């Protein structure tokens, strides 16, 4: 068998992994953030402000991302995994349900469904892009429908290596089979899909701001949506299920009164992270 491998025919005992001399003296990271003076100034301003968390910089960052992508609502959150967890919960995914997603992704895309007692099913990917194959998704949906299986609640498409998935075709399939479309857009901030920003599609999309992503907040993520009901549910899930807005309280008992109306998590992003994200 012929091969074009650069190590074919060489003495593999000379490879560093087998005791040979390394070609580098220092570790080569798989990604690295870019931090400039304005980023440092933004973080310093946040550190010396009145709010380190739950302050105005959260909304500022959310608005900036929502405006860039072209959606109504954004919910900044602790990390990309938390973003997926929150999105799945808001979509009503729960015990016994199933999602269809891509095997070419970070584990969190699947794990977030397992957190809720659901099960991931895997569609194939296109060999030229690594993106989830709409034809494979359709095959899974059709096969499960023929079996009378109504457990599939969502298709979770993964934007991969800066490439948005085939949003239009996947949305058509989601509508046809009455499932939700959610976009894991961790790789597509700044990308374009038919003249629109990556991550605009589906009932929700999620992003990550880990240092290997397009912009970073250290750790951090965001959920984007045009649905006000989903937005409200995401806000509650992010912060212990707490409701502070006067018009949504069951009763009102002074300026510091709040209600824990549902079960939620502490998945909040802090103002220091948000300041860095807005600067980036």
Predicted features along the sequence, with ranges:
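Phosphate-binding glycine-rich loop
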Residues: 51-98, 112-114, 122-124, 146-147, ...
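Structural detector of well-ordered beta-strand residues that form the stable sheet scaffold
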Residues: 75, 100, 121, 180-182, ...
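Active-site region of PLP-dependent enzymes
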Residues: 188-194, 201-280
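Conserved coil-to-alpha-helix start sites within the AMP-binding
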Residues: 105-110
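N-terminal "arm"/small-domain region of PLP-dependent enzymes with the aminotransferase-like
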Residues: 1-52, 56, 259-261
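Active-site phosphate-binding strand-loop segment of PLP-dependent enzymes
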Residues: 128-217, 222-230
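Structured binding elements
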Residues: 117
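Hydrophobic/aromatic ligand-binding patch that stacks against planar heteroaromatic rings
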Residues: 111-113, 173, 272
